[in-house]
Amino acid sequence: MIVSLNGYVLNDPTNPNSLYLDEPIDGLGLPPVRTSSGNYSGRDGGYVGSQFYGMRLITLTGFFFSSSPAALETSRRALAAAIATSSVTLNITTNGGNQYLINCNIDSLDMPILRAINKAPFKITLIATDPIIYDNSSSGSMSVTVTPARGGGITWPITWPITWAAGSQPTTVNNTGNATIYPTITLTDKMTNPTITNQTTGQFFTLTGLTTTAGDVLKIDMKNRTVLLNGGSVLPFMTSTSSWWPLLPGNNSINLTTNDGTDTTVATVSWRSGYRGI
């Protein structure tokens, strides 16, 4: 397994860093589950409430190896500099060739100094506030274009020969991972009261009273729960019955509607597939 922290490579024999991981590597299985539970009063048993994933704690341990004390100290400083920022991007390439991405924050870096002059241990602890392990392969980051739904049929008054217009169908979005993912949806150009629906979950997101013109860009971030029109928040237009909906694992049917037949908007649904564990 090859690991990189903000681009600083560990456990790669072809890399001059000469940092190697020890086992075990903790924190890459199922994330901690937050559970609300209790015992029934006056009878047997108990109950379990809603369960959600908590933050993921990842621990990497290993050794520096070097040909000289000076080179060893250089490696120690380089590792500390690589993860000194609050945000750490953890990239993993497994022995099976799969590539993953985890967004982390640094919790601690311990590098005790030993008597040995050519090697030193290290222990890195990372906190992933987002517990999803994302697919970092070339097919992991995906996007699909969704056009507004239009009904089929004929236009009155009838002209001959009669032309029957085809109706549009929902767009299929395939989340190839095994974790529920919250997408980012970008709508452009003219739209009136847009509604974008995940028919698979039965949830929708509507902005009532919102009208845009050609060149406008509306960005809905389902994960971070923001709605920006040309960079400014338009969250007050969100209806009280709307939901910040996710993409379930597998196929999801996505539908876009607006209130004006002359609207020209299209939506781009973007996401990165993810997993509950490696």
Please place each PLM-identified region on the residue numbering.
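Beta-strand elements of well-folded, non-transmembrane domains
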Residues: F64-S66, S108-D110, A128-I132, D189, ...
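Short, acidic/charged, Gly/Pro-enriched secondary-structure junctions
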Residues: S4, F63-L109
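Charged, amphipathic alpha-helical segments and their flanking helix caps
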Residues: T74-V88, N136-G151
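Intrinsically disordered, low-complexity segments enriched in serine, threonine, and glycine
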Residues: S139-I278
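Solvent-exposed loop and beta-edge segments used for protein-protein assembly and interaction
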Residues: F52-R56, A82-A84, A116-A120, G177-A179, ...
